A protein has these predicted regions:
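Feature 926 captures the class I aminoacyl-tRNA synthetase adenylation module centered on the KMSKS loop
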Residues: 3, 211, 403-463, 467, ...
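N-terminal catalytic cores of NTP/NDP-binding nucleotidyl/phosphoryl-transfer enzymes
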Residues: 40-103, 156, 165, 225-228, ...
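Short, solvent-exposed turn/loop segments enriched in Gly/Ser/Thr/Pro and often Arg
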Residues: 43-45, 53-54, 87-100, 153-161, ...
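Alpha-helical support elements that line or immediately flank enzyme active sites
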Residues: 65-67, 290-295, 504-512, 649
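Secondary-structure transition/capping motifs at alpha-helix termini
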Residues: 77-85, 106-119, 139, 143-148, ...
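Active-site-adjacent "gating/activation" loops or surface patches in catalytic cores
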Residues: 263-268, 454-489, 655, 659-662
């Protein structure tokens, strides 16, 4: 037996109850000390590599993290046991906006702002915060049991990754794929930074649609335009109509007078306008709307920006300058109404863009920003998916991926914050020459001046994350890890960052490395509450993984999440399900305790020298079923069908190994037949060993603890070989006969239950089986049948009829009879049945009355009526059973 710090040498016992807190802490520390998670680069083994989706350094483990990392760990532990050189790279993301917000809030408690500190001191303060608090989520991932190679932990702002970021930026810039320009962007007035399209979340909002009269410049009439943002009209520089719309052809030479101002703006004719929508006229605000920006470019319209970076109206807003944008909206509407320009206001539901970090309403605005020209990169990524170099699971995401990539817009990568990768670009203060370099130049390459100013913007956090699969392996250096583990094997992540992150890693990996970053992408669903609603603190339906791990144990949470991780299906999680799987963990524990009572003194070799041909049915059947469980579990994990793997193991462990096999072999284990006992011990140990290994990737702690109390010297279970099917154990005939055996046992137990025979009472059983083969099989199993059903006398006949006063059960074509004379109190049981009959008849009448009620039938929802009909069917069937029971009892008089 191996060294187990919880057990004295030679002590092959498990505690009565599984104390998971002590076990989890002890074994995780032991794994770290033994360096069980470290990757090796043995050329003789296949490699399996996976990079963790780096959680934000500000993060705290939530149930989505728990799901994602459990799935990764299941796969990593499985591949490690399959003999792969397995690398799981951990790390955290610097989370530019989120982290800066956290530290700014910290400063606010000291009555300071980042501007009081200045950029350099503020960055120092963020690094200080990261050193003090940034490891929280890493420690929580360890609590979850994650077997990452922690010696390779990375951070998106560490020096190695910073070098990779600078190298890629400069390369893309010199290739013409990064450029700087004044374009329309998504602007967050709270964070005071640009956001990429993917960082804007659209929320359905009940708003208003304002219909405004725009007078013709010559006073001859007006056109009505509609907008949800009347405050932006101050930046209008045109009204657009369709070129073929005859209603407005006369306005070409007249123009429009902009309400509330003294400005005249032109009418432009553009095919973007839909003639049938509204009045067919569209206000054009090039500085505050993406489509208007494009129209403005086509018609060379002036750009008038009417808000500053904080969402405050600026001097271009005239008398409205200084008003916050939504306050300005109210004032504008009031003034439009007062001056007769407001036609009407309609209630209007529409999607409003919000900052993904602070939920502030985003303002489209023109701004000088840095962009990546992504179309050529996207084309390479799409080609890689189409030709199968990267596969997406589940397949339902292919079309979504193609549609998004085909319509992708250039990626705004600059952010107006301080925390992040500062863009490696410099401007000469003397000659204005512009340079983009990996390292700060000593002097201007044009005039030689040493007075250089670096670009103040930082890169979008997703830029560094896009390089994660190869930057974490040492690129741009030519490392051994890069050669051995890139491309990585699979990426497991939630579907909601398919475009934030997955697509960008695809684009960068293919362009920079010449190879896809991963061969498979597995996209899992989001975790919702048991009703399918989004979890949120405000609704109080959040399941905190840290709380449930403390309550039910890490293995119970991991098994629950694995069992619920069906491909393409929403995950509805309830705490009671976690509690239910805690019972499963206890079932494993108790089964192991029972087994140890009988195998603790055995030679461990007995589990290796098994000749199935010489074994009784129980052993041949369980080995056959174990073989099937091995095959199905391996196939499920290879196909990323995590829930199917959990389902196979749950069924095998609970229903077959524990409920059937252990009960079936008790007579051998407790009996005096030495040969039967030795056979039972050998198979029991073999099945338990293999079952623990099958379970280990999902439930690592309880399996490791049990593994070390089995007979013999043992290393960690995680370095054991994952079970492979044994052809010698395949035995379909045993499976067929065992199914017959279980059906008969189930039938006899059903009679006991229905007839309310006391569990300890011995019964007589008559089995009538006409089939020659089945008859022979049941005859050979009569001893086991008697033991499992507490039967005193059992007869297996080819012909026979029901004895008087006997209860019966039909299993396929086999009749089972149990004479009830002397086993039941006829008067007492008849009284019980009569009471149940009266109650059921009353309930049946109530339900039938409902369905006969015209008012109920007219007003009740269809599903309610269907439920009542279902109840009627159930009660009628119940009454039939009661009637049969009473007739059977009457025969006993």
């Amino acid at each position: 037996m191996s060294e187990n710090p919880s057990l004295p040498s030679g002590d092959h016992e498990l505690a009565k109850a599984y104390e998971f807190k002590e076990v989890e802490a002890r074994w995780y520390q032991k794994w770290l000390e033994q360096k069980n998670f470290q990757a090796t680069m043995d050329e003789g083994k296949p490699s399996f590599s996976i990079v963790i989706p780096p959680p934000n350094v500000t993060g705290v483990l939530h149930v989505g993290h728990a799901l994602n990392n459990t799935m990764q760990d299941v796969l990593v532990r499985y591949k490690r046991m399959c003999g792969c050189n397995t690398l799981w790279v951990p790390g955290t993301d610097h989370a530019g906006i989120a982290t800066q917000n956290v530290v700014e809030r910290q400063l606010a408690t000291e009555s300071k702002s980042r501007h009081d500190l200045g950029r350099e001191k503020f960055i120092e303060r963020v690094w200080q915060w990261r050193e003090e608090k940034g490891g929280t989520i890493i420690n929580q991932l360890k609590h979850l049991g994650c077997s990452c190679d922690w010696d390779r932990e990375r951070f998106t702002m560490d020096e190695g990754l910073s070098k990779a970021v600078r190298t890629v930026f400069v390369r893309l810039y010199k290739e013409g794929l990064i450029y700087k320009g004044d374009y329309i962007v998504n602007w967050c007035p709270r964070c005071k930074t640009a956001l990429s399209d993917d960082e804007v979340e659209h929320e359905d909002t009940a708003g208003k649609l304002y219909h405004i009269r725009y007078p013709y410049a010559d006073g001859s009439g007006h056109v009505v335009v509609a907008t949800t943002r009347p405050e932006t009209m101050l930046g209008d520089t045109g009204v657009a109509v369709h070129p073929d719309d005859a209603r407005y052809s006369h306005l070409r030479a007249i123009g429009i007078r902009l309400p509330l101002t003294d400005r005249t703006i032109p009418v432009v004719y553009d095919h973007h306008v839909e003639r049938e929508f509204g009045t067919g006229a569209l206000k054009v605000t090039p500085s505050h709307d993406r489509n208007d920006y494009e129209i403005g470019l086509r018609h060379n319209l002036e750009r008038v920006k009417v808000m500053d970076d904080s969402g405050i109206m600026n001097e271009a807003a005239g008398p409205y300058a200084g008003l916050e944008r939504f306050a300005c909206r109210k004032q504008i509407v009031a003034d439009l109404e007062a001056q007769g320009f407001l036609e009407k206001i309609e209630e209007y539901a529409h999607a409003v863009g919000q900052c993904y970090r602070c939920k502030t309403v985003v303002e489209p605005t023109t701004s000088l920003q840095w962009f990546v020209s992504v179309k050529p990169l996207a084309a390479q990524a799409v080609a890689a998916v189409r030709d199968g170099r990267t596969a997406i699971h589940p397949k339902t995401w292919y079309n979504t991926f193609y549609a998004w990539m085909d319509n992708i817009r250039d990626w705004c990568i600059s952010r107006q914050i301080w925390w992040g990768h500062q863009i490696p670009a410099w401007t000469c203060d003397d000659c204005a020459h512009f340079m983009v370099e990996e390292h700060a130049p000593a002097a201007c390459e044009k005039c030689g001046s040493a007075k250089l100013t670096q670009e103040t913007d930082v890169l979008d956090t997703w830029f560094s994350s896009a390089l994660w699969p190869f930057s974490t392996l040492g690129w741009p250096d030519d490392t051994k890890e890069l050669k051995f583990f890139y491309p990585t094997s699979v990426l497991i992540t939630s579907f909601d960052i398919l475009f934030f992150w997955v697509a960008r890693m695809m684009m960068m990996g293919i362009h920079i490395m010449g190879e896809v970053p991963f061969k498979d992408v597995y996209l899992h669903a989001l975790v919702r509450d048991k009703h399918g609603k989004k979890m949120s603190k405000s609704t109080g339906n959040v399941i905190d993984p840290l709380v449930v791990m403390a309550e039910y144990g890490t293995d119970a949470l991991r098994f629950t999440l694995t069992a619920f991780a069906a491909q393409g299906r929403e995950i509805k999680l309830a705490e009671e399900r976690i509690e239910g799987y805690r019972h499963f963990i206890n079932k494993i524990w108790n089964a192991a305790r029972f087994a140890l009572m009988h195998i603790k003194e055995c030679d461990p070799a007995i589990s290796k020298d098994i000749d199935p041909a010489a074994l009784p049915l129980a052993h041949r059947w369980i080995l056959h079923r174990l073989n099937q469980a091995i095959t199905e579990t391996r196939q499920a994990l290879d196909d990323y069908r995590f829930n199917d793997a959990a389902s196979v193991l749950y069924q095998f462990v609970w229903n077959e190994f524990c409920d059937w096999y252990l009960e079936w072999i008790k007579s051998d284990l407790y009996g005096d037949n030495a040969t039967a006992k030795a056979q039972a011990q050998g198979v029991l140990l073999a099945v338990l060993e293999n079952t623990l290994k099958l379970l280990h990737p999902i439930t690592p702690f309880v399996t490791e603890e049990i593994w070390h109390v089995l007979p013999g010297e043992r290393t960690s279970i995680m370095v054991e070989a994952f079970p492979t099917p044994n052809p010698a154990w395949d035995d379909p005939e045993a499976a067929e006969l065992a199914a017959l055996f279980m059906g008969i046992v189930g039938g006899i137990r059903n009679i006991r239950s229905e007839a309310m025979i006391h569990p300890s009472a011995e019964i007589e059983v008559l089995i009538v089986c006409h089939d020659e083969t089945k008859h022979a099989g049941l005859t050979s199993l009569a001893g086991s049948l008697k033991t499992l059903t507490r039967t005193g006398t059992m007869a297996v006949q080819k012909e026979g009829t029901r004895p008087k006063g006997a209860a019966s059960y039909l299993y396929t074509d086999i009749e089972i009879f149990v004479p009830l004379a002397g086993l039941v109190d006829v008067d007492k049981e008849q009284a019980k049945l009569k009471k149940d009959q009266d109650k059921t008849e009353a309930e049946l009448a109530r339900c039938q009355g409902k369905l006969a009620n015209e008012k109920f039938m007219a007003n009740a929802p269809e599903e309610v009526k269907a439920k009542e009909r279902e109840k009627i069917g159930e009660m009628q069937a119940k009454l039939e059973k009661i009637k049969a029971g009473m007739e059977r009892l009457e025969e006993l008089r």
